[in-house]
């Protein structure tokens, strides 16, 4: 009998300690509408959708190791440091980009957030044994917007070559038509809530180890051998 009473007292004491612990207090405050909020986990480097050597010989494993493992990772790490302790902590990436676009006092946050998004989108714009032509609705929209697939390809490569300095070349949907646009540095169509279908990174770190100053050759390899048209088509609205 004494043993049972002792066990009961132990359980009651343990329960009381749990109820007043910081974890439970924060959870109760959050659920009751208090200003105290539980901070969401920081951003993490997203996994590549393929192995680092999967895009060879068009993009080498060495380039992918630096581009993904160093550059992309640095943007993620910088973003986490910059938003920590601010009203942007715990917000979705797209919201951070749209709230900081054009804000001079939040330029560093925008640049790193946009580059995290742009790079993640770039990886999913490619696949091993990609390229060729799209089919179905996407092909029809390309032919309607550019006259033919070959004209689209020429314009896309030319736009990427003409982009001065670092930046990105995009295929975006504008209602029932498609457009090729370029953005400088970290800028991104999502900042203007545009619907991007695919992108190619024309920062030098994306191609210089493999192509040196031959950006056109890199862009041509992208459209001929790497574009994931299924992924692009899935983004149509």
Residue ranges and their predicted role:
Residues 1-5:
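N-terminal secretory signal peptides that target proteins for export/translocation
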Residues 6, 19, 29-32:
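Intrinsically disordered, low-complexity segments
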Residues 9-22:
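Bacterial N-terminal signal peptides
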Residues 27-237:
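Feature for soluble, non-membrane regions of globular proteins
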